[in-house]
Each structure stands twice: as C-alpha cells, then as structure tokens.
Amino acid sequence: MEITLITVGKTATGYISTGIDEYCKRLKRYVPFSIKTLPDIKNTRKMSEEQQKTAEGNLILSELTSADHVVLLDERGDMLTSRGFSVFLQKGMASGKKRMVFVVGGPYGFSPEVYSRANSLLSFSRMTFSHEMIRLFFTEQVYRAMTILKGEPYHHD
C-alpha cells in the first residue's frame, strides 16, 4: 500500500523541510510514501473563507481516486497513540487498498465536499499547530509506526 500526504501550500520553513526530508528518506525502506503539495490559492484576499475552502477542496478532490482511503488530519478527528496509529496503518495495509491518502487542509480547514469524501478524521492534538508543523509530525509518526510494526527500537512506551 502506498501512503500519500496531500498538503495545500509549500513548506517554507527550512528546518521543517529538512526534518520532513529526513523522515521521507527513512521511510523509503518501509513503504512507498509521497507528498503531493498543491499550490496556494491565488487572490485569497478577495475570497470569503468558504470560497477559499471550496477552491482548495476542488484541488484536493482532483488528486483523489474513488479507490483511495482518505484520512483528513483535522482537529475534530480521532486521537490515537503512536501504537494506535501503527495499528491504524496496519489495518489499512491489510485492507487491500492500493493507496491511503492523508490530507492537511488550508488555513480554514476543509470544504463540506472534502469532509464528505473522507473515510476518517484523525487529530494529532487538541492544540492547534501550523500546517507546516503537522507535515513534520505526520512524517515522523508514519516512520515511528513503521518501526513499531517491524519491532525496531525507535519507539519506547
């Protein structure tokens, strides 16, 4: 199973990009993993929040196939431990789905259409983090989950 992270807007902070690149490099030995960065919406000052969410939602939906298992990284989602997340990924891999797609939305969240397409919602914390930080946290947690599943000594309970 391939794991894809879809994000809106590029990661501009150098140290975050470096961390993401490091975990992507580490993940290559475990699972096909990719990050698809969608362009920021232009002229957002002229748009309402709803218009911006709709425009971003259309971009996100255009990247998905009907066969994808879609997980939104959303503050209202289920919270899992690192071990729980590894079980979540293991179940996804065992399901026979070709691709599990995790999505980080734009600054205002997701459009109703994206929520409707989602198979599940996952939250990293009750706190709010920058979208860039979530990208780093996510790639690290996927790496951690893979080491847990392989019984490797990266994770400590």
Give residue spans per PLM region.
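Conserved RecA-like P-loop NTPase ATPase core
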Residues: 5, 71, 105, 138
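Short hydrophobic segments within beta-strands
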Residues: 6-8, 36-38, 103
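N-terminal beta1-alpha1 ligand-phosphate binding loop
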Residues: 1-27
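Structured adenosyl-cofactor binding patch, chiefly the S-adenosyl-L-methionine
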Residues: 112-156
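S-adenosyl-L-methionine/SAH cofactor-binding core of RNA-modifying enzymes
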Residues: 32-34, 39-98
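Conserved strand-to-helix beginnings and helix N-cap segments that scaffold or border functional pockets
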Residues: 17-20, 82-86, 115, 135
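Loop/turn-to-beta-strand initiation segments
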Residues: 2, 97-102
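Short glycine-rich anion-binding loops that position phosphate/pyrophosphate groups of nucleotides
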Residues: 11, 75-78, 106-109
